[in-house]
Amino acid sequence: MLDLRIQQHFIDSADLHYQVADGLAKPVDAAVQAVLACVTGGGKVLTAGLGASAGLAQYLAGLLVGGFERERPGLSAMALSADAQMATLWPEEQGLASQVRALGHTGDVLFLISSQGSENAMVQAVQAAHERDMSVVALTGHQGGALARQLRETDVHVCVPHERVARIREVQQLVLHCLCDGIDTQLLGEQESY
């Protein structure tokens, strides 16, 4: 009964992936270069997100430390915590910013993931990163919201221009895979097709 509806989800997702591929290639490449400059220069990548985006942030940190599709030494990365225990230590909006101030240093990258970019906690995290002379990579959806407006010219904004959160997250996961593949290609060279 739901066959056609399910098929439509696949079609809609594939269509969006195809539509945004050209527009996202350059910002994803810029994100690769920012992360690569950070980790090869002795810095670390702090990843963060709220809600479901926190899961993607943890996933990215895991891929950077543990590798993507090829063996390589681990890269210095960690996911900032947005869980309930940490939330009791600071007011909700200050939690990520407090962690950035405690763990971030000049030359590090703060990699934020948000479907909308409207969360005040993310905006405060960007401000904290800038205070620490860190670069910011923001992976957002919609138009990037207040988060995008906080970015500097030297930061990187990868924005999935879509309104549906499910579709945004699907593309964001592919962006993370492209990022990790780009890093591996830069570090290890081209790999033959699979």
Predicted regions located by residue number:
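A charged, well-structured terminal subsegment
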Residues: V165-Y194
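Surface-exposed amphipathic alpha-helices with a cationic face
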Residues: V126-D133
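Short glycine/serine/threonine-rich phosphate/pyrophosphate-binding segments
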Residues: S53-Q58, L96, S118-A125, L147
